[in-house]
Every structure is written in C-alpha cells, then in structure tokens.
Amino acid sequence: MDTSKNTLLKFANLPAFEKITSKDMYQAISFLVQENKKIVKKIESLEKLTWKNFIYRMEESDDKIAKAWAPIRHLNSVMNDVKTRNQYEKSLSLLTSHYGKIGQNKKLFNQYQRFYEENKKNLNSSQKKLLADVLQGFKLSGVHLAPKQRKLFRDSQEKLANLESNFEQNILDSTNSWSKNYKTEKILKGMPKNSLEIASEVAAIRKQDGFT
C-alpha cells in the first residue's frame, strides 16, 4: 500500500481539505489501524513499561487516527457524494470493529493496570486522570465479560454504529433534497447579494422563476 501521497497521513499542519480525495479516506484509516495493531501487539509483551514506550505510543497512535478521521467525518457532512459516503461508511465500520476489540483486549488492559499500579506514586494528576479514563473505558467496553457476551457486546456496538450512520445519511439526504422557491426578491430582503445570485442560478438550473 503506497501511502506516501495520502494527504490524510500528513500531520504536520492543518488538514488540506482541498487536496483530500475519496481514495485517501479508507486507505488512511486502514493504514493507521494496521499500525495501531502492530503497536498493541508489541506492548502486550513488554516487560518493562514506561510512559514513553507504552502510554505515549498508544496516545500518539490514537491521536493520528483521530486526526485522520475528523476531516473524513467533516467532508461526509458537507460533500456527501457517493464516493465520499462509501469511503466514510467503510472507514466507520473498520474503526468500530477495531476499537471494539481493543476495548476488550485483556492483555492490553492488564498492561495498563500494571503500569498504573507500579507508577501511581510518581504520576501527576493529569497522568492519573488519563489512565483512570482508559481503564474505565476498558470496563465499559466489556473487558471483564465472558467470551460469548463480549462478542454480543461488539456486535451490538457495530449494529448501533451502522444505525447511527444510516440515520445521519437519511437526514443529509432529506436536507439536500428539500428546497423552497420564491418568485420575487421582496421576501428575501436582507440576504447578501452573492447568496441571491446563487439562489437565482439554482432556480434557473431547475427551470424555475425567481430564487431557490
């Protein structure tokens, strides 16, 4: 997978929205999820845990995923063409599945718990809060459930994510399909000139009089 030209994987600056393509979306999320899996695999077997080789690496990896995902969500909301929607839905499905499994990873949970117990005397309040939230997240994700219950929980999470996504897409479709036509400019008094010009152009495209 050649990701060298993927705009979503360049984290030095603010997102370059004008350069992001639909092809970039799932490719970026898939790549970052695979990288996250590799990091988790290494951390599971670490004997000596430090903030730098454990917590920082996990936070950095999760932060990259969040930074790539945020523009995808935004573009899905404001563009919502067929290609963008497909890439968004594929990416959402992958992320939901991945983090559902991460949240139930007992080896990783035990490493977090061990690190906290071994280092809590030397941690500042912010570090303690971060770890407390992470440990609580594992518990809320069903890390202590029996195997069959863990799978049921993950399946329910994925189903809920799909339902939420479908609901959002239906709202966008309804919003995009709705329009109101005004025959005269009088009722639109106060609207900026450029907005009126756009409304007039839309009306003309739809073979309507006035403004849409």
Per-range role (PLM):
Residues 1-212:
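Zn2+-dependent metallopeptidase catalytic domains
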